[in-house]
Amino acid sequence: MSRVANFTSSSIHKLMSKGRGNWSLENVGAPFKSYVQEKIYEARTGVPMNKDISARPAIWGWFMEQWVFENKMGLDYSLVSKKRYKHPDLAWSGMPDTLLEDSVGDIKNPYTLLSFCKKVDSLESLESFKSLTPEYYWQLVSNAILAEKEYAEIFIHVPYEDELADIREFTELYDGDQNKVAWINWATDDELPHILKDHYYKDLNHIRFKVPEEDKELLTERVKMATELLNKAI
């Protein structure tokens, strides 16, 4: 199943943007409009406007997702990051990283420590998570809808310095393009994101919450609007 001409969970926060004034369903922002236009172009060409990113931050995120799952997640979790869920009626799909019986989850591995610290600080409450990290929040809401789960959770991770040697060895076991992760094996410690133990931040940070029904409904309505605009244009 392709993501071409589908509004995807990873970018769905753009559809929740607002224009000037208070938020309302009709008051869409510039990111909403540009994202819809991007999907119109994809529908007209049959190819994605933004192909898989080969930059190191993206590669690090994909690679570490598998490492975190195999080394730091409980046995109850299933890694499903290669399975795409599709809405039955709308141009809408998503790929959560993890599943439990009642929840979807995502594993995030920021490439910069500044980003890591900011993202972890946003987990102080559900309200701060939603306002400070909307791209993560709405991705979880979207995946919860598509996978029909009541709860959502996110894991924000950075390795400890003494884990970097094991991470380099893991490149040989990586279930993906070995050429893309080869640089991790020869990178110095200073070139890889990491923190030290016994300081303020810990390696794996987590929040789990019941997805508000109101937010499910609002997001669904915005995707309906976007799908209608897409269908009219093609």
Which residues are covered by each model-predicted region?
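Acidic/proline-rich low-complexity IDRs
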Residues: 14, 74, 78, 191, ...
